[in-house]
Structures are given as structure tokens and as C-alpha cells.
């Protein structure tokens, strides 16, 4: 069922808002950073099968908790490539069972580094063996999966226990750290590469959580970029650009930075260095993106303790790629239309902050044009898209990209109707 939440939330009352005459609620926030760097070699996700041979930089869960007096919300940013929607669902079931946290109150975003371990089963990727080859023919380290999940549950509980009076602010900036990656070859083929004239989203979205005295609790930075500055020959565990940048900004501002990817489906880092983890160009991301985040933070002129949070969710149904199989674990993400066409069911989540900011999130590698079109249609002052959140259903390209071909359409479970179905569902 298609539900119109983006415009409807702008026009209607905010769920949980304070009625006239009520005592103002106290907004509270907290942040926890948990090291999940493995102690043993791990198979790295992304590219061909590779077993890690060391650690270049450590990887983390970063967990922000927010509470407006009615709604408690947790945002997680984890330095891994992807999880599947059923893996997220299992986390939600555990959080409800052990901590009493209702499903949907926790969003789990992965930064999409291609130099971190696999976590959880991979449900869709193996269906595209003709394109992806043997990259999923690896051993699963379920003990490490359990460590990652246990650490996340404990971190969420710890963040909730540390909630303190806070203020919140939102600002946007710009960074030129990314580039369209759908390169057109001389023979007309589309291949992964660099397309400098192609569409790219360079908006930096920034949320600041601070104490009443102005000292920072956490920053949340939203930017579209594949975690592929390090290539398929790298065997060192790394957070890639999101991890480099987070550590750099944390050193500058003195608080954790949650990096949440945007619509990075057709967006690459400006520089990729292959397996040369000592390439000096990697440091340039500190300037290209890290300093842009620091500048956006410095430009924030106001924060507020008067914060109201409203969570929403809808499901977009759109046709499934003809002939594509499905797995039992993804049964909740499939349906059949009245005319017998197999459908993919895509959950879309929303967080509205007061009446000026909306964040929408989906378990997708969305093409940037789609997110930018939604932003252009939004009545909110700030509209942010959180990609690869609460799982991954792989790529959702534009209709034009399906016609052009290339890597992303070849590993998409969708059809060329997906762009229109998805956009109309969240903007009308």
C-alpha cells in the first residue's frame, strides 16, 4: 500500500507535539561509540572474496539516542557494508524482548565500507551470480556476527541510560568529495568508473546534539558516497571514507560523528586508490569531506531544546525483476499484485523533527537523482535521505539507467517502473 507521508506530515499535526497549556517536555540525548573491530581474520564484504590480513583503522557502532518526552529514538551507524532487512527485523525483535523497545524506534544504518567483515546472511546478492560471481562463496563467522549484534544491543541500552538534557540543530552544507560513477565507454557501454558530468548529490546534512552549555554530544552527518576508496585488492580492515572522515571530525569537535550514507547508488568517492592503503590521496578526504562537515557544524547559528519527534513508516510495492528468484528469509518483502505480477515490498521510514526537518530512510542503494527529486518536492526546510538503513534490497536505479544498462541495473531486483512508483509514494 502506498502511503503519502512526506507531504502529509508537513500539513498535519506532528505526532507527540505539545498541546497548548501542557508543561514543556525536556529533550534529552546521548551517544555511545562501541568498538567492533574483529580480533581474527574475517571475510570482507564487497568486491571478490578476500580474507582480512590486518587492521588499518578500527571500526565501530556509533549510537545516538534521542528522547522528546514521548518518543525515544535510536540511530545507529555501523562501519560495515550492508545487512539484510530480515537481520534488522531480528534485531528489532530482540530489542523488544530484552529492552522493551518497540520495533521501528531503532534505525540501523551501515556506512557501506567495502573493507569490513560480512555480518549476517546475504539474501539477494547470491541471486545475481551471473554479475557478482563468487563474491558470496565464503565462510560465515557467526561468532563475529553475534559479537556485533550483542555489542549493538548493549550499546543501545547504554545510550538509553545516559540520556541527558540536550539541544538539537540541523544545517546543510556542501562537499565535493564524490562523483558520478556511471562512465560511458567509447563503444557506448556504461561501466563503473568516473562520469564527471553525471548527476551527483553533494549536500552534507548535519544534525548536532549538544548539552545546554553548548558542548557537543554527537554529530550526525549525511552524505552520498560509496565506501570504495579502497579497492578490491585491499585486505586491511577499514571504515574507508566514512570511517576516515568520522575519526577526523571527532578529533576536531570532541564528540562522536555518526556517518549515515545518502543516495550513493550511482555515486563514488572522488578518488579510489585500489589496494594502496598508504596512498596520500586518502588523507584528502579529511579536507574534502571532513572539513566540510566541520564547517557546517561551525555555521550552525541556533539549536533548540524544544524538540518534537514523529516516526512514520510506509511500504512501497513495485514490480520485481522478471525471472528473479527470491528467498524464504525475504518472504515479508515480497507480494503478488492483483494481475499476478511478483512485487518487491520496500519499507520506507520517516523521522520528522519539529516542523522544519524530515528524514526519510530505506534499505536501498538509491540513485541520487531520485533522492534529489524528492528533496526538491519536499515542503520541509531540511530533507535528508538515509540510505542503506534497516537493511539492503540492493540498487534502485532511475528509469533512464535501466535503459542504459550497466552494473547497477544488472544487480537490481526492480524494474524501470521503480523510480516512478517510489517517488510518487513518498511525495504525493
Explain the meaning of each model-derived region.
Residues 22-109, 113-258, 262-264, 270-273, ...:
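Conserved beta-alpha junction segments in alpha/beta enzyme cores
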Amino acid at each position: 500500500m502506498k502511503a503519502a507521508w512526506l507531504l502529509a506530515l508537513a500539513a498535519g499535526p506532528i505526532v507527540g507535539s505539545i498541546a497548548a497549556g501542557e508543561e514543556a517536555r525536556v529533550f534529552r540525548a546521548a551517544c555511545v561509540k562501541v568498538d567492533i573491530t574483529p580480533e581474527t581474520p574475517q571475510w570482507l564484504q564487497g568486491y571478490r572474496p578476500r580474507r582480512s590480513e590486518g587492521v588499518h583503522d578500527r571500526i565501530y557502532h556509533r549510537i545516538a539516542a534521542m528522547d522528546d518526552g514521548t518518543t525515544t529514538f535510536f540511530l545507529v551507524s555501523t562501519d560495515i557494508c550492508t545487512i539484510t532487512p530480515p537481520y534488522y527485523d531480528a534485531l528489532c525483535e530482540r530489542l523488544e524482548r530484552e529492552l522493551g523497545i518497540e520495533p521501528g524506534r531503532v534505525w540501523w544504518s551501515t556506512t557501506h565500507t567495502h573493507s569490513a567483515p560480512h555480518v549476517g546472511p546475504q539474501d539477494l546478492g547470491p541471486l545475481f551470480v551471473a554479475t557478482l560471481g563468487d563474491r558470496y562463496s565464503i565462510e560465515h563467522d557467526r561468532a563475529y556476527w553475534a559479537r556485533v549484534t550483542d555489542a549493538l544491543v548493549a550499546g543501545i541500552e547504554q545510550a538509553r541510560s545516559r540520556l541527558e538534557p540536550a539541544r538539537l540543530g540541523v544545517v546543510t552544507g556542501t562537499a565535493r568529495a564524490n562523483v558520478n560513477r556511471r562512465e560511458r565507454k567509447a563503444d557506448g557501454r556504461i561501466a563503473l568508473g568516473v562520469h564527471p558530468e553525471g548527476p551527483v548529490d553533494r549536500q552534507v546534512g548535519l544534525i548536532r546534539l549538544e548539552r545546554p552549555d553548548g558542548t557537543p554530544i554527537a554529530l550526525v552527518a549525511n552524505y552520498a558516497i560509496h565506501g570504495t576508496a579502497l579497492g578490491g585488492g585491499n585486505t586491511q580492515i577499514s571504515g574507508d571514507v566514512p570511517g576516515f572522515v568520522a575519526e577526523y571530525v571527532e578529533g576536531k569537535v570532541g564528540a562522536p560523528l555518526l556517518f549515515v550514507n545518502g543516495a550513493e547508488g550511482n555515486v563514488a568517492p572522488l578518488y579510489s586508490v585500489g589496494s594502496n592503503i598508504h596512498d596520500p590521496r586518502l588523507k584528502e578526504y579529511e579536507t574534502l569531506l571532513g572539513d566540510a562537515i566541520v564547517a557546517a557544524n561551525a555555521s550552525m547559528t541556533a539549536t533548540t531544546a524544544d524538540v518534537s519527534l514523529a516516526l512514520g513508516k510506509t511500504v512501497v510495492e513495485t514490480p520485481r525483476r522478471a525471472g528473479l528468484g527470491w528467498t524464504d528469509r525475504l518472504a515479508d518483502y515480497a507480494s503478488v499484485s492483483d494481475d499476478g505480477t511478483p512485487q518487491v515490498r520496500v519499507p520506507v521510514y520517516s523521522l520528522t523533527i519539529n516542523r522544519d526537518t524530515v528524514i526519510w530512510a530505506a534499505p536501498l542503494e538509491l540513485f541520487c537523482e531520485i533522492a534529489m527529486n524528492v528533496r526538491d518536492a519536499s515542503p520541509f526546510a531540511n530533507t535528508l535521505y538515509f540510505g542503506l538503513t534497516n537493511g539492503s534490497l540492493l540498487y534502485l536505479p532511475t528509469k533512464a539507467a535501466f535503459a542504459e544498462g550497466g552494473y547497477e541495473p544488472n544487480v537490481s531486483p526492480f524494474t524501470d517502473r521503480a523510480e516512478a512508483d517510489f517517488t510518487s509514494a513518498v511525495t504525493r
